[in-house]
Amino acid sequence: MATVHILTQYVWPDAAPTGLYAEQLAARLEQDGRDVRLVGGRGGYRELQRKRPVARITHLNHYRGSRGNLRQSFTEYASVTRAFCDYIGRFVRHDDVVVVTSAPPNTVTLAQAIRRRGARSIYWLQDYYPELVRGLYEYPVPLRAVFRRFWDHHLGRWDRIVKIGSNLGGPTRNAVVIRNWPTMSFDRPTAPEPRTALYSGNLGYGHDIELLVHACGKLRTAGYRVTMRSDGRGAWQLPAWLQPMPLENDPAKLRDDLLRHEVHLVAANPKITQAIFPSKIWNTFAARRKLVCTGFAGPMIEELEISKLAPFDRHLEQWTDLIATAQNSGQPNRVERIEPALA
């Protein structure tokens, strides 16, 4: 039986958002009877207590930097990517399928290593880095164009790119949109506490903190109690009245926290509309809570409106269908033109 290898920087027991989605895809494939390996590093992003998701999990050795230190982070990115390349050379076989997430970003260069093994390659584009880096430094337009050409050249080498939103940049020739889904179930949503609002998650390079603080201020003036649970560089920039609390590391408590609040806040950056699409909106939709978005502009607003109508209970099924098609393909390196939308 051909193996599906899913590679991402952080995997269980860590709970980075990209890693959570990777493990939930791996669990679904394992339930369907496929041979699956979930492969990641040994670094840490965020703790979340939960059971082992699949039988076969491989943690690779690599340099581990300090989160928040850019130099050390980039060194870790390079080290993780080298570890992935070594894994591909040692364990990937002809007709296998290799799914690689955009964490770390250097993995965009791995398509050729997968191709040399005669396997199918799928790149899971959660973040489009030529635009995301603008949240760190608004670099000159000519340099931005060079970076986009470099990135798009490497994206074009993959058999498939799966974008989590239609607003993400990158080529369309080999791309398809399969949106994310709720990472937890809300079988019986309860009534929230009135006049409560919650931001829960990372505040990083893709978020405009000033716009988020302004929205929180308006809610506060309207009588809402605003709870801020966040980490990341943006959390350091919050005013005293919005000082963040620790993120919940117990899934049951996180679910209760989401259900307890009437309004969920989601932040973006209007300057970088092709970089990301916040995955936390899917838990908000599933919990049937009100959504307040800040920093959404242009294609992000269009994607938000599509997402409100998207059948998120089918998105994992779309993934399994895509992988089944890749496994059944007699020509692993052939790319057919497809439209960049499934939902």
Predicted regions and their residues:
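Conserved donor-binding/catalytic core segment of Leloir-type glycosyltransferases
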Residues: 189-207, 213-216, 227
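Acidic anion/phosphate-binding donor-loop and adjacent secondary structure
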Residues: 176-195, 208, 330
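Nucleotide-activated donor-binding/catalytic signature segment of Leloir-type glycosyltransferases, i.e.
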Residues: 230-258
